[in-house]
Amino acid sequence: MAAVSNESQNPVDPGSSKLQFAPFSSALNVGFWHELTQKKLNEYRLDETPKVIKGYYYNGDPSGFPARLTLEYSAFDINASIPARCCPAFGTLYNTNTFETFKSCDKKSLLEKEANEIWESIKSGAALENPMLLNRFLLLTFADLKKYHFYYWFCYPALCFPDGIHVIQKPVCLGDRFSLNQIQALQKAYDELCQTEGVTAFPYFLIKYHDNSVVVSPLKKWDGFFQDQGGKVTVGVYDPCNLSHYPGWPLRNFLILASHKWGNILQSIEVLCFRDRTMQGVRDITHSIIFEIKLPQGAFGPDCPKAVGWEKNQKGGMGPRVVNLSECMDPKRLAESSVDLNLKLMCWRLVPTLDLEKIVSAKCLLLGAGTLGCSVARTLMGWGVRKITFVDNARISYSNPVRQPLYEFEDCLSGGKPKALAAAERLQKIFPGVNSEGYNMSIPMPGHPVNFSEVTMAQARKDVATLEELIDAHDVVFLLMDTRESRWLPAVIAASKRKLVINAALGFDTFVVMRHGLKKPKQQETGNACFSTAPGPSDLLGSSLFSNIPGYKLGCYFCNDVVAPGDSTRDRTLDQQCTVSRPGLAMIAGALAVELMVSVLQHPEGGYAVASSSDDRMNEPPTSLGLVPHQIRGFLSRFDNVLPVSLAFDKCTACSPKVLDQYEREGFNFLAKVFNSSHSFLEDLTGLTLLHQETQAAEIWDMSDDETV
């Protein structure tokens, strides 16, 4: 999990007269890299400006552990709490966009910049008020989010004395210098200081001790604190190091502070490296070390001293480290992050205003799990949609797998698996993060009687109720069935429930993809006549050119029909019963159906968006993704598409006010009449029968006029 250096395990000879320090080792939790990934994708994007982050270090590790500076998932929230009895350290993150930038970055300049900030805090006295300013770090990173390889290089800036620091008294354990009473008094005094300051760990503090008493105080209370000590000065440092002869890295910058502030009045200073370990429930600070050093005088000018601090890599050389998380991260979370990667990259530069949440959170119901259904499902997954539900009553046949990419040869055996169930199962195998369900059920249709028996009527009632529940539970309904009449019932239910409907249908080398007009909310229709779905004279102003037609006045799949839907498979040959089309057509139409949905969702008015037509191709697009058409009609023989717009028909057999009113008032009783009757029932209800009669009468009058002439 954490990358830890072992270089502090091999210190120099303790007999050296100059003080040596055990450097920090970086310890980056997997949660840190996961959070960096999310920040990079969703927030930073191409931004390379420095970011403030927070880590912590601990002075209670068991013997043998290196001095670690830890960064967790909460490192990006500087106000987040850290574990108890740990000391915070603030740093700067430099996250680069490319590996080349990471390699060529001026490390010397970055170190000097951080060192100058520490030096300025020392000169200004800010470090006395806030000692945490002495423990800064910087982190240079590059995240390869395709492979989940993370390159990083830590730096712990430490200012240096020109001639080093000479040791007067070598480090010894606190238990060898202090009595038991003094140790207990020190522990109590330190706890009281932390409680007074409202923290659980304090990085630097002043100490004065007598035979049986110890007093500690913050650095800012230096003046007058040591007046009764006869020139003896002792300071405490919260020390993450475990070595018995060497202090940890946090002492370095403090000694620079001490030399700059008090070097002219002090010749030496006693240092207590405070280490606070709990073993088997017993707290122990006796392994802390205490020693005396000679404090250099006049060692600095106005300029920042030389600084060091770049961490060595695992091989012990000066270079970055790399961590490969592609294998240790949860495969499902990896899949989710990877699925979202390309989508979020769109927002970086190409489409900054793209609202991915609207797309990802859309719950999609696919009525039909055949050639169109498979293509639509795969494209929806490409857009990151997490909720996909299939409805189909067919089983997978041997002709299906080559045209329907969610199925395999094994799915055809033993009579074939139910398409809806197999499609839902396959989506979860492709991407475990998708919530896919399948319903193996029939959709009752006009002209297909269900009144053969009580059993068939009960089954039809159950199927209608299930379909109503499914449409109610989803945001977008895709009509992808083979026959025209099978689209009628879901078109009626979706229109009544004000759901967005995307329809796709195929010919041999032609297709139509369209969005149904989205009716205004019922309270607006009843409360204000201007929201009537039937277009009045003022509504049609300019509509003859099929421009500026709002979404609630757009027609549905049945609005261009002058006959009611019926049994289209009766008395048809095999080639007329099956959908015979060019193999690539379904993938084109399926992709366009999903892209139309996405464009509608990105429009501020959603399904009520004004329809774009072919005439709008040269105009300013209404969304960041371009046009929002009503229909897309494609002609593969000419490799051409057109974008027609049509108004809602007040005599439509699916979305007209008369049909919706009858459905909402009578429910299944009305639907049963449609299923069990001929097409004349819907035509009589909507006025199509009268329209036919008027048309025939007009033709008779025309013929009479011709004969007279």
From Swiss-Prot:
Keyword check for Plastid: no
Alphabetized CDD domains for the sequence: Apg7
Family matches, as SUPFAM superfamilies: Activating enzymes of the ubiquitin-like proteins
Entry GO MF terms: Atg12 activating enzyme activity; Atg8 activating enzyme activity
Chief place where the protein resides: cytoplasm
InterPro entries reported for this sequence: Atg7, Atg7_N, Atg7_N_1, Atg7_N_2, ThiF/MoeB/HesA, ThiF_NAD_FAD-bd, Ubiquitin-activating_enz
Pfam families named in the record: ATG7_N, ThiF
Biological-process GO terms, alphabetical: autophagosome assembly; autophagy; cellular response to nitrogen starvation; mitophagy; piecemeal microautophagy of the nucleus; protein modification by small protein conjugation; protein transport; regulation of circadian rhythm
A cellular component annotation (GO) from this entry: phagophore assembly site
UniProt keyword Transport, yes or no: yes
Subcellular localization: Cytoplasm; Preautophagosomal structure
Active site, per annotation: 578
Alphabetical UniProt keywords: Autophagy, Biological rhythms, Cytoplasm, Protein transport, Transport, Ubl conjugation pathway
Family from the record: Belongs to the ATG7 family.
UniProt subunit comment: Homodimer. Interacts with ATG3 and ATG12. The complex, composed of ATG3 and ATG7, plays a role in the conjugation of ATG12 to ATG5.
Domains: entry comment: The C-terminal part of the protein is essential for the dimerization and interaction with ATG3 and ATG12.
Physiological role: E1-like activating enzyme involved in the 2 ubiquitin-like systems required for cytoplasm to vacuole transport (Cvt) and autophagy. Activates ATG12 for its conjugation with ATG5 as well as the ATG8 family proteins for their conjugation with phosphatidylethanolamine. Both systems are needed for the ATG8 association to Cvt vesicles and autophagosomes membranes. Required for autophagic death induced by caspase-8 inhibition. Facilitates LC3-I lipidation with phosphatidylethanolamine to form LC3-II which is found on autophagosomal membranes.
Name of the featured protein: Ubiquitin-like modifier-activating enzyme ATG7
UniProt lineage: Eukaryota, Metazoa, Chordata, Craniata, Vertebrata
